[in-house]
Structure formats: C-alpha cells, structure tokens
Amino acid sequence: MLINHLSKIRTVRHFSNIKPVLSKEVSRRVIVAPASHFKTSSPNVKSNIPIHEYKQLPEDSNYIEKHYKELQVFLNEFLIKKLNKTYADFEGDPDELVFQLEKFIELEVTPRYTNHSAPDGCEERFKSIGDRIVVDRYLDFVKDVRLTLLLNGGHSFIFDVMLQAKEVFDKMQKE
C-alpha cells in the first residue's frame, strides 16, 4: 500500500527569486529599449515621444535648465566618449536619447554611488546621503529630458544649444 501511495507522487517545480551571484542588476529599475532596437518592430511603430515641428520652450523651463551639470556630464562622459555623438545626433529619434540616458544612469552613475556589499533591499546601499541625492538628481534629469522632448516636438538639438549658450554666458560673466 505504501508503494502504491509513493508511485502517485508528482514532482513539483520550485521557483526561486534568488538572483545569481554574477547578476548585473544595480537597481530595481526596468529599462526598455525603444522599438527600433528590435528586428521584429515594424517601421510604423509610433515613438513614445511624438516628433513634430519645433516649439520653443516656455520661459519658465527651469525643469531642464537646472540640469546643466548633468547635461554636460552625460555629453562628455557618455555621448562623446562612448558613442561618438552629440545631442543633435539623436534628432528624429528622441526615444533613443532617453534610452541611452537611462542606460548611462543605470550602468555608470548608480554603481559609482552605491555600496555593492550592502544586502539587497537595504536603504543604506548608498555610500552617503549625498550619493543618494546625486542618483536621485539624475533620475529627475531623465524625467526632465523626456518632458523637454515632449514639449519641444522631440528635437534633441536644443540640449546642445543650451550648453553652448551657457558656455558663452559664463565667458561673458568672467570678463
């Protein structure tokens, strides 16, 4: 009877949510590549950021103007150094610019300011409160870049223009 009972035992699959030791996960953010990255995407796929005629940013566009430092760092450390591009090179594909920015934050900014020896789910992953502020500022930066692109018709050249104008203004102030 015991043998009959044992023969009816089914194997059960067990799932585990333990991440592998060699995982590349830095944060719990999910980054989705634009449709242009997938071979199966059709050419008619609409962009998340609509592309239309250029519209000037409002006078109170402090949401992007407060990020001059981040604009410059992203341009110098990632776009020019790794991709050999400027902001204007993403004209016509604003989703790609946002994706590259999210990738930069996830793969370069976040690891630079986090402590990888801290246990998962621990709020003290950041080396200091200042490091957390830097990462949060970059996360705000990507939101503000997306908002700017939505408001101005998806034209990325504006970021190059803003940086050039600030450089000229700073030179004038020094004189």
Curated annotation (Swiss-Prot):
It is found in: Mitochondrion. Induction: In aerobic conditions. Expression is regulated by copper levels and the MAC1 copper-responsive transcription factor. InterPro entries: Fmp23. Residues 1-38 form a transit peptide. Disulfide bonds: none annotated. Its main location: mitochondrion. This is Protein FMP23, mitochondrial. It comes from Saccharomyces cerevisiae (strain ATCC 204508 / S288c) (Baker's yeast).
